[in-house]
């Protein structure tokens, strides 16, 4: 996954990360309002501790696609994100 100079690739990468994380959560029978973006990053072959992931995570939050759920944690102890209505719309984009 790489950002393109025009920035369109960055949005696409963030959307792909959100979609993969959401689909993983649904397939696992988990709460469909929550997404583990770190696990989604690993599914995409991305380092969940890397700078690229951190930038995509910030992008997802700034765009309002997901927000931190301070009462839930993922397997690594990080905050799980709650997907928003805007995020669900992004996941549903073709």
Residue ranges with predicted function:
Residues 1-29:
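Short alpha-helical segments that sit at the start of domains
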Residues 28-44:
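Short acidic, hydrophobic short linear motifs in intrinsically disordered regions
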Residues 73-77:
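Short, solvent-exposed loop/turn segments that connect beta-strands within catalytic domains
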Residues 46-63, 78:
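Short amphipathic alpha-helical interaction segments
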Residues 78-94:
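Short, amphipathic alpha-helical interaction segments positioned at domain boundaries
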Residues 61-72:
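A short, conserved structural fragment
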